[in-house]
Design a protein with these regions (language model features):
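Conserved helix-loop-beta element of the AMP-binding
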Residues: 26, 127-140
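Beta->alpha turn/N-cap motifs
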Residues: 1-7, 12, 68, 97, ...
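An extracytoplasmic/periplasmic, membrane-proximal ligand-sensing/linker region
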Residues: 124, 171-235
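Short helices/loops that flank or line small-molecule/ion binding pockets
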Residues: 80-84, 98-108, 117-125, 214-215
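Conserved functional loop/turn residues at catalytic and ligand-binding sites
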Residues: 4, 18, 48, 93, ...
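Hinge/capping helix and adjacent helix->loop/strand transition within the periplasmic-binding protein
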Residues: 12-99, 146-148, 153, 158-193
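Alpha-to-beta junction loops
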Residues: 1-2, 59-63, 87, 105-114, ...
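Short, well-ordered beta-strand elements
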Residues: 2, 26, 62-66, 200, ...
Length: 235
């Protein structure tokens, strides 16, 4: 089975979910990772997070951020940025990135945190401008854009995907699938396709290391939800 940042980090926080996915499944291996970019329309009067927060404070109630939905990773991430910078941004939830992009381009909403693969083409074409990247280091595609950490947020918010198995799967099977996935990920053709989609091959990880990483991710996002006081409700 495949999993990602959202299910592992968020489901445990939602009412009605009786299990912690980081404990209910056995980790196999991470297979891809990327980052997000905080963006704004090119006509907005700010170029970084400090400018966004300052403009919001100067125009109370007028500055907003779009998200792909309540409880989505970008929603929690942006709300944490909002909290750390005391930005006073208003959340405007949509049903996915494609739904809010027209409003972001027109200035109907002021900003958004988008997946890099979706945001970069719009940035390169001059339709959006980047304010920050959520990776632990600056993006080679945007070397002049500072990370969240560099702008005082104190957080790194990567996105990742990986494979898991039911709890109780024999360790020998987990190890074998882990090795098989490593071989697949070493393929130069696959790595080129990843690069085209703004994805990275994660460092090699044992099942135990990936399991620990999932637990850490769930704890990190739980802490952000607690600090921002966001309520997540399962349907």
């Amino acid at each position: 089975m495949q999993t990602a940042t959202g299910p592992v980090a968020m489901n445990v926080l939602m009412h009605g979910k009786a299990y912690d996915p980081a404990q209910a499944f056995a980790a196999i291996a991470p297979v891809a990772s990327t980052y997000m970019i905080v963006v704004a329309g090119v006509n907005q009067p700010y170029d970084d997070l400090a400018g966004l927060a300052a403009y919001s404070k100067a125009t109370p109630g007028k500055v907003s951020y779009a998200s792909a939905g309540v409880g989505a990773v970008p929603h929690i991430g942006t709300e944490f940025v909002n909290l750390k910078l005391d930005g006073g941004l208003t959340h405007v939830p949509y049903r996915g990135e494609s739904q809010f992009i027209p409003d972001l381009l027109s200035g109907t909403v002021s900003s958004a945190m988008m997946i890099a693969g979706s945001a970069l083409p719009l940035i390169k074409s001059g339709k959006l401008k980047p304010l920050a990247v959520t990776a632990s280091r600056r993006s080679p595609a945007l070397p002049d854009v500072k990370t969240l950490d560099e702008q005082g947020v104190g957080a790194t918010l990567p996105l990742w995907w990986g494979f898991i198995a039911p709890t109780g799967t024999p360790p020998a099977i987990l190890d074998k699938v882990n090795r098989d996935l490593r071989e697949v990920l070493a393929d130069p053709a696959l790595r080129k396709r990843y690069a085209d989609m703004v994805l990275e091959v994660p460092p090699e990880s044992t099942p135990a290391q990936f399991q620990a990483s999932m637990v850490d991710e769930a704890a990190k996002w739980a802490d952000m939800v607690r600090k921002t006081r966001i309520t997540l409700t399962a349907e």
